[in-house]
Amino acid sequence: MQKNAVVLTGAGQIGMAIVRRVAYGSKIFVADWKLENAQAITKTLVEAGFDAVAFKTDISSRSSIIELIEAAKHAGEISMFINAAGLSPSQSTKEHILAVDLYGTAVLLEEFGKVIKQGGAAVTISSQSGHRLPALTEEADRLLATTPPEELLKLDLLRSENIRDTLHAYQLAKRCNVKRVMAESVKWGERGARVNSISPGIIITPLALDEINGPRGDFYKNMFAKSPAGRAGMADEVANVAELLLSEKGAFITGADFLIDGGATAAYFYGQDNR
């Protein structure tokens, strides 16, 4: 008897916390561009009783994504997809961040939308950073939402000369993620499936520690110190929301984004410094 297949892209703490909640009894494909990262998460899952396999995937490559999907389909129908892959502003160049976080996510949503089973669901991890980007025009939002993935990086607003730095590239990518989820949810609905995004704030993971200990470290520490929650978040707190979105309890939720940042974005716009 074939199992359902659950695919995780991005072998990190948030992704692992989510699959531990939702994927017991399924065949889990843990994909990462660094195979050793996928193997480490897979080992932890297997030792906890899960059926998991590691897979090397470059999400900036459509062919690599399709290869992952084909492998998962051999195990069973793909019932859930969790995308927790991405690069932070301190980890790479503007161009690479856009290729992975923006283009890669757009392709993932498109390709998994073609194969997700009826009743299936997906979550992609975006970021609070996209909520801090000043409002774009209605036309810019439409282009980010609906431009075919192979044409996305040719848009004027995504040309290198129009992007200030890696943080700006990251913010645009995360804004695009949310808009793509909205547009893709309409197509996913035709298959009886759902897709949503989660925009976490500072969650203690190796990726976040790169930022906290990087050149913008003081900015991030000050940010969560001034937030209503007064602290950084935990991966399990993101998984709490993902579990709802991937379950039948979230059956009426699709095309939505959930900001989980301890109120940091609220403080950014409306805190004491802005009164």
Give the positions of each predicted feature.
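Rossmann-fold cofactor-recognition segment
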Residues: 45-63
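A conserved structural motif in NAD(P)-dependent oxidoreductases
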Residues: 15, 227-238, 249
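A glycine/serine/threonine-rich, flexible loop-to-helix segment
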Residues: 136-147, 203-226, 267-275
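Conserved NAD(P)H cofactor-binding loop of Rossmann-fold oxidoreductase domains
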Residues: 82-89, 100, 126, 263
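Short, small/polar-rich loop/turn modules that mediate ligand/substrate recognition or access, typified
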Residues: 194, 253-255
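Catalytic loop of short-chain dehydrogenase/reductase
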Residues: 89-91, 118-191, 200-205
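Canonical Rossmann dinucleotide-binding motif of NAD(H)/NADP(H)-dependent dehydrogenases/reductases
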Residues: 1-29
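Conserved glycine-rich Rossmann-like NAD(P)H-binding loop of the short-chain dehydrogenase/reductase
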Residues: 24-40
